[in-house]
Amino acid sequence: MKMRLFLFLFFFCISLAEAQKMPSNRSSVYFTYGNTGANLREFNQMLDQKGLSPMRKAYRNFGFGYQTRYNDFVLGLELFQNNGPKSLFNGYELDYRTTRVYLNVGYSFTEEGRFQLIHYMSLGSGFMNFQMLRGNPKKTLDGFLQNPAHGFILRDGDIHKGSQHFAGFLTEIGFQLSYDIEIPGREEMVQVISKFGYSFSPFEDSWLMKDIAFGNAQSGPFLRFGAGITLPDHNFFYKDASLGLHLSYGLHFTEPDVLNAALVENGYRPFEGRPNNLGLKLLGESKGLLYGIDFYNLGLSGAATESSNHTLNSVRVYLNGGLKFFERRNLELGGLAGLGYANLRYTLTSTDKPDFPALFEEPDRDGHLKARGLMGKPELYVAYGIPLTNKNLFSMIVSLHGGYELPLGNYSLGGVGMSSYMANPYLQLSLGLRP
């Protein structure tokens, strides 16, 4: 149902842009940072009943956005990572984080120019992780697997299993102010952005975990500031420059053999199959030079025992640069090199946790191990563009990407190196929009 609504809004905006006589367009990519006010009311009430101080009423936002403007109509996509404040209770660290993805539809109150004022509405889904953990005293993987419990971990829309597990219905209404600053000698411009508005989790029963509603962690008034790169059409011949966003699905030809051996040795079931990913790819071009950003999320999950589940998750972010080798009509071939960041997290959770407040009083149920480091990759791609309008305002791009990921570190989980799992050949199929 949500996907149908997204597609309806997408093609509705296409038809509006197509109907206008003298189209102008621009594409922008940006990063933002800000704060959102939020009160975990039900959880804080439980703390108050126990004579404890409440959690602070705000969380931080770090966001990535892509936006395309056609005349006065705006279409975009945003990805947010939100981190709540940390609190200490009896040696346990209590905190939460959420991830959201939004499709934005908006309207500009200003003519195309350096200054823009846009009103927009967003529809999307999310993920929530709420945890209460103490330091894990077990220094080895075997020691952790023999006694993993050092707190509790609650998840809704668990993308540690894969991005397809995003859940819930989230909305946002806001305003965007931006101003373009020239880059000497370049047609691209720096865009300085501010955003303010309100995030909503509209359904009361959503984000209910262990008899407490955490929906306020997905809502609240926000103020964000940021900057990015914009490509206004009056600065460019679009055969020389473009900026497109792609939804990608990938297969990674690797398995966690080292971890599986340790799991079996300690009485757990191994992970089955290979990880796949669902992610976003930004790919821009300026006079034959390519640049871009990749975000994707690998997940494996399954039953560990009769009373526990486990996940193996890795989020990867790459900055890419390269060259376009060949272009003829709608077909193109290019190569990219990427340098990025990756984490690796193994989580073991009990399936029979009690509800609050009993869970708060006896929290030792779950545990996790994590590692992080740098990654590199070479990549080749072939793409084909399909014009979507008679005026050739933008094209749908179908691409096939292939490459090899190289871990620049050991990625140790409890002293066991996982670099052999992180190193892998991969294939990705992407579908995108490019002006």
What are these regions (language model features)?
Residues Q20-N71, W207-A213, G220-K287:
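Short glycine/proline- and aromatic-enriched beta-strand/turn motifs that initiate or cap beta-hairpins
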Residues N25-S27, R56-F62, D95-V101, F115, ...:
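Residues that define the transmembrane beta-barrel architecture of outer-membrane proteins
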Residues Y33-N39, Y70-D72, L79-P85, L123-N129, ...:
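Transmembrane beta-strands of outer-membrane beta-barrel pores
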Residues L47-L52, S87-L94, G157-Q164, S206-G215, ...:
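Extracellular loop and loop/strand-boundary signature of outer-membrane beta-barrel proteins
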Residues N71-L154, H165-T171, K287-L359, D366-Y381:
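Gram-negative (and chloroplast) outer-membrane scaffold detector with strong preference
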